[in-house]
Amino acid sequence: MDISVYVASAFSKNNKGGNKAGVVLNEPTLTTTQKMAIAKQLGYAETAFLTESNCADFKLEYFTPKEEVALCGHATIGTFAILMHLNKIHKSRYTIETNSGVLTITIKEDTIFMEQNQPTFYDTIPANKLTGCFDLNLLNTNYPIQIVSTGLKDILIPVKSEADLYALEPNFEEVKKVSKHYEVVGMHLYTFNVDRIICRNFAPLYDINEEAATGTSNGALACYLYKNHYLRKENYVFEQGYSLHSPSEIFVNLVISNKDEIEKVYVGGKGYYCEMQELSLK
């Protein structure tokens, strides 16, 4: 059985870089095992499978080479970039059924925004619990290390400077152990000033040592920065992927209520069609 798979890059910067994902359109008969096999053959962090939905415009399922995950920001942006490439987008608002619920996609010109879940703030973690993961002297102790989710749980870890962020060498086996212990997808490391927020993301538990652009992690980080009054904006731009030579830009827009609470979280980015691959399934 041959399957056509699109490859898209999401969260690209100036039509370059970004994070690649596989996109499979309208193959409703594929089994979970086959979807996993496709994701593994492609070898990208995630592959999205789009089918019809009874409760939304589309149904999207996401597979890493190892297992199914509830949600994936860059694979969603990538899917809609492919639909735009195929001239199948005819309105500015769509709904998608995912294992994280029904979410809204908004398209503004060439930028695709994806609604996230409202933020959930979990435990803060003492730095010594990360011993062995990387050099703890590079961490910025002015800000708490915390687990936050807008769909997927990540440990948000502040680093002193951009130079320190790139100098940091993770021990992926230790990162994997800590991620498993705290039941998170991975670790999202960041440094920021008034003008820039720069990140790196490690998810070796899901066979992704480092990822060039992560939508859900930056959605969580925007909420963390806003709620704690560290950097208050309604529109954030996160930069990621430089250490992988794949510069990426992730936009996060927060909708804030009159009571100064985060009502909605939208993660957005640009994307482009890369190629099409034909895979053989046994």
Show which residues each predicted segment covers.
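Active-site proximal loop and beta-alpha junction motif in alpha/beta enzyme cores
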Residues: 1-71, 77-282
